[in-house]
């Protein structure tokens, strides 16, 4: 076993990486409120795992979406638990993100030289809200349908580009299959990918600059 480790160590310098990860200085003023960002990340990972599990049963069509969600909740093994955890962790993720934003703002964590860390955090907040909007519609029940209709209709008030923007969001002139397909693609692929990229940027900046000091 040691020979295998030595082979990887010689090529990847695993010990140096481990030492760098475990040797970062943690300021004495850090308390439990500095864990809110990490809790948000944990909720996101739970979302990814449970969401991936549900893709095996969910059908993104206007005729089968609601029935597939019912199947997940009533017939699929542990489907009710997986979907419930997905919903609970979604609510927890939003709550932890809001508290994290307040903590960073109140402790001045957005100030120089951490402006870009703050910017990536704001982008992540927008992405998190987008998860809520797109995920809310996927069961394609009455609540989901009318929520999509209202949300996608908001840009229509914008002069000149309002109507084309609404049609872009809906995929057609009215809410239907194209809309559900777009929201499903956004919720399961585009938004998770963007979130993963910006989270990586966010954590690398924190890693480089360290935790902000007290007020």
Curated annotation (Swiss-Prot):
CDD domains: Cytochrome_b_N. Heme b 1 binds at residues 100, 202. The keyword Amino-acid biosynthesis does not apply. Heme b 2 binds at residues 86, 187. One of its GO terms (cellular component) is chloroplast thylakoid membrane. Heme c binds at residue 35. Gene3D superfamilies: Cytochrome Bc1 Complex, Chain C. The chain crosses the membrane at residues 32-52, 90-110, 116-136, 186-206. One of its GO terms (biological process) is respiratory electron transport chain. Its cofactor is heme b; heme c. SUPFAM superfamilies: Transmembrane di-heme cytochromes. Binds 2 heme b groups non-covalently with two histidine residues as axial ligands. Keywords: Chloroplast, Electron transport, Heme, Iron, Membrane, Metal-binding, Photosynthesis, Plastid, Thylakoid, Transmembrane, Transmembrane helix, Transport. It is found in: Plastid, Chloroplast thylakoid membrane. Heme 1 (or BH or b566) is high-potential and absorbs at about 566 nm, and heme 2 (or BL or b562) is low-potential and absorbs at about 562 nm. Belongs to the cytochrome b family. PetB subfamily. Component of the cytochrome b6-f complex, which mediates electron transfer between photosystem II (PSII) and photosystem I (PSI), cyclic electron flow around PSI, and state transitions. This is Cytochrome b6. It comes from Eucalyptus globulus subsp. globulus (Tasmanian blue gum). The lineage of its organism: Eukaryota, Viridiplantae, Streptophyta, Embryophyta, Tracheophyta.
């Amino acid at each position: 076993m040691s020979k295998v480790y030595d082979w990887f160590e010689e090529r990847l310098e695993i010990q140096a990486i481990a030492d760098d990860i475990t040797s970062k200085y943690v300021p004495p003023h850090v308390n439990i409120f500095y864990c809110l960002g990490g809790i948000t990340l944990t909720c996101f990972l739970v979302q990814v795992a449970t969401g991936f599990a549900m893709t095996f049963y969910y059908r993104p069509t206007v005729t089968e979406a609601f029935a597939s969600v019912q199947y997940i909740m009533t017939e699929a093994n542990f489907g009710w638990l997986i979907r419930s955890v997905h919903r609970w962790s979604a609510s927890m993720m939003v709550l932890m993100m809001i508290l994290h934003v307040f903590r960073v703002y109140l402790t001045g964590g957005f100030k120089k030289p951490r402006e870009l860390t703050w910017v990536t955090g704001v982008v992540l907040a927008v992405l998190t809200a987008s998860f809520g909007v797109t995920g809310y519609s996927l069961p394609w029940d009455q609540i989901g349908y009318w929520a999509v209709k209202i949300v996608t209709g908001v840009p229509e008030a914008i002069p000149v580009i309002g109507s084309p923007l609404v049609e872009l969001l809906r995929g057609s002139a009215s809410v239907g299959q194209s809309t559900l397909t777009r929201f499903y693609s956004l919720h399961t692929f585009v938004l998770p990918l963007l979130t993963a990229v910006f989270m990586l940027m966010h954590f690398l900046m924190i890693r480089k600059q360290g935790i902000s000091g007290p007020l």
